[in-house]
């Protein structure tokens, strides 16, 4: 109670007045159309597509000087052969050598047929490249809030897939559209109402091919026959998936698609394969419960399913928004079919 009072402290007001208060500059935000909702799956697909492009550019052979010289020499040789053939036909006509003219006509028809085949193959390869461009455009539209580009784009996709205007899903999609819908909303509605028709068919093909590969490996005792059968089934699966999505494959376009699928699996699919299959197998100890052939059959079936899933991604015109197929979707089905088959075989 008897403590002495503290001395008074006087503050200078000038220091507070002269002190400059630093404030951040205010930001004025416009309407909501400038903001895009964050979608982690679309971002993951964008990163995967960027990785795939880097892989393709790395694997693409660079044009060297020798290849350019060979190209020029081949062009000169081709022009010389055509000129020589024209001169030979002219001399045969002057000399009335009808046998030579007949041979020249047959050779000309063969050349025309070969050129037609080359043009057809080029068109099919171009169609496969165009599908990749369409997928990139769809990814851009999914981030766009503009109006006027989404509807004709989706109508063109439906036409390419063979879905006519009288299809129930197409009619339901058309009835849900309004003038106020932007491009992103139109594509989302199309991916929810129309695109699942083709996805369901592709999933059924993958399930059937994976089940056949699993049962073939688990039951058949011939390894070489198994390898040939699975290779043939995998090529047929890729052709069937491409046909479902409206892509007609030729010889070189089929090889290109198969190469893209294998490259995608090798570089982008190994981690997903280990994550979805390895941990589940270790937790349930399936390898100990099943025989060696059965385990090999399940592995072959899952690889076939993985190949089909990547073929879907490369042939599908739209990027995945939701319901992306995973190996876990086919794993339980394969195990159940294998157990039923082995159980029936033991009873017999």
UniProtKB/Swiss-Prot annotation:
Signal peptide: none annotated. One of its GO terms (cellular component) is plasma membrane. Keywords: Cell inner membrane, Cell membrane, Membrane, Transmembrane, Transmembrane helix. It is a multi-pass membrane protein. It comes from the Bacteria. It is found in: Cell inner membrane. The keyword Magnesium does not apply. NCBIfam families: hyp_HI0043. Belongs to the UPF0283 family. This is UPF0283 membrane protein PMI1371.
């Amino acid at each position: 109670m008897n403590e002495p009072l503290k001395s008074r402290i006087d503050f200078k007001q000038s220091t507070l007045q002269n002190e400059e208060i630093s404030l951040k500059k205010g930001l004025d935000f416009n309407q909501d159309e400038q903001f895009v909702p964050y979608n982690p799956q679309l971002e993951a697909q964008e990163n995967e597509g960027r990785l795939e492009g880097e892989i393709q550019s790395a694997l693409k052979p660079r044009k060297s000087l020798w290849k350019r010289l060979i190209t020029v020499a081949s062009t000169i040789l081709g022009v010389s052969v055509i000129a020589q053939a024209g001169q030979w036909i002219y001399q045969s006509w002057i000399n009335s050598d009808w046998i030579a003219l007949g041979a020249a006509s047959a050779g000309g028809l063969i050349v025309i047929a070969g050129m037609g085949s080359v043009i057809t193959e080029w068109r099919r390869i171009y169609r496969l490249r165009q599908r990749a461009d369409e997928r990139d455009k769809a990814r851009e539209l999914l981030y766009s809030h503009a109006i006027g580009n989404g509807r004709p784009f989706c109508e063109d996709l439906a036409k390419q897939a063979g879905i006519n205007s009288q299809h129930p899903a197409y009619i339901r999609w058309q009835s849900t559209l309004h003038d106020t819908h932007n491009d992103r909303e139109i594509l989302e509605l199309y991916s929810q109402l129309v695109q699942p028709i083709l996805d369901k068919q592709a999933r059924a093909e993958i399930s059937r091919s994976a089940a056949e590969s699993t049962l073939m490996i688990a039951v058949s005792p011939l390894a070489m026959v198994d390898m040939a059968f699975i290779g043939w089934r995998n090529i047929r699966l890729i052709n069937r998936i491409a046909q479902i999505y409206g892509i007609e494959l030729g010889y070189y376009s089929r090889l290109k698609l198969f190469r893209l699928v294998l490259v995608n699996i090798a570089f982008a699919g190994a981690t997903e394969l280990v994550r979805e299959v390895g941990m589940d197998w270790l937790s349930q100890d399936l390898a100990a419960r099943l025989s060696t052939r059965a385990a090999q059959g399940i592995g072959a079936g899952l690889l076939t399913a993985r190949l089909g899933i990547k073929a879907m991604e490369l042939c599908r015109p739209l990027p995945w928004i939701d319901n992306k197929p995973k190996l876990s979707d086919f794993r339980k089905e394969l195990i159940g079919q294998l157990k039923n088959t082995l159980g029936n075989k033991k009873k017999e």
